[in-house]
């Protein structure tokens, strides 16, 4: 059975693909950001003793590999092709390292690793909170009994509307869950679009 691209399949299939893309983006982003910032800082700080040049070159090559990984992820989640970048052989020694450092595409790959990280943090947080929050609020009536009860433990409904009714508390949280789940598909789609457009803008020859 042919696989349906995430960007063109049924809503549920596309939603799972986009949610997986966003949630997997943070751990990958942490690793990529660490490589980019650490390698760049170490390379620049040691340029005076020449060891910085191969460190920078190695960092840029690693950035290129990580950028290709993101290109594959973007192509998979959008269902649109995203050509990989295959740099020519840089050569060995100082000449090869210098050739890598002079390659503009390598620097764009590195910039993407750094710039994309804050967005990955935001999209991960919003996607996780919106999805799990919606499920948790919808099922509030099944676990609200475990919350501390008493004069010093006021629920959101009581704080907002001065209503301590348990029915009102359950009703408010259930409606909140319905609203979150009713809007989760467009929210996830918007977050995915923001992240993939940034990738296409920095990792391809033309913006999406």
Question: Can you describe what each PLM-predicted range is?
Answer:
Residues 44-79, 181-186:
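Hydrophobic alpha-helical membrane-embedded segments
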Residues 82-115, 153-164:
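Short membrane-interface loop/juxtamembrane segments of multi-pass integral membrane proteins
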Residues 65, 69-72, 76, 141, ...:
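Membrane-spanning helices that line or support transport/gating and their immediate boundary helices
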Residues 37-54, 136-173:
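Membrane interfacial helix motifs at helix-loop boundaries and amphipathic/re-entrant anchors
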Residues 76-84, 202-208:
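Membrane-cytosol interface motif
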Residues 1-8, 159-170, 177-208:
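Cytosolic/matrix-facing juxtamembrane and C-terminal tails of multi-pass cellular membrane proteins
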Residues 24, 28, 51, 115, ...:
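Hydrophobic faces of alpha-helical transmembrane segments in multi-pass integral membrane proteins
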Residues 15-40, 73, 97-131, 137-142, ...:
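Short, structured motif recognition centered on aromatic/hydrophobic residues
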């Amino acid at each position: 059975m042919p696989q349906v691209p995430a960007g063109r399949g049924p809503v549920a299939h596309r939603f799972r693909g986009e949610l997986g893309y966003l949630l997997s983006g943070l751990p990958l982003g942490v690793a990529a950001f660490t490589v980019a910032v650490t390698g760049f800082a170490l390379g620049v700080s040691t340029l005076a003793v020449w060891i910085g040049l191969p460190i920078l070159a190695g960092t840029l090559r690693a950035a290129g590999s990580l950028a290709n990984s993101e290109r594959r992820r973007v192509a998979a989640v959008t269902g649109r092709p995203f050509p990989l970048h295959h740099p020519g052989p840089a050569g060995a020694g100082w000449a090869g390292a210098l050739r890598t450092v002079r390659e503009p595409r390598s620097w764009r790959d590195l910039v993407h690793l750094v710039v994309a990280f804050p967005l990955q943090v935001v999209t991960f947080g919003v996607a996780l909170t919106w999805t799990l929050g919606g499920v948790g609020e919808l099922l509030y009536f099944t676990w609200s009994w475990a919350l501390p009860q008493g004069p010093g433990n006021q629920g959101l409904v009581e704080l907002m509307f001065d209503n301590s009714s348990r029915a009102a508390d359950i009703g408010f949280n259930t409606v909140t869950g319905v609203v979150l789940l009713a809007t989760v598909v467009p929210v996830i789609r918007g977050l995915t679009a923001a992240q993939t457009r940034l990738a296409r803008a920095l990792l391809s020859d033309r913006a999406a």
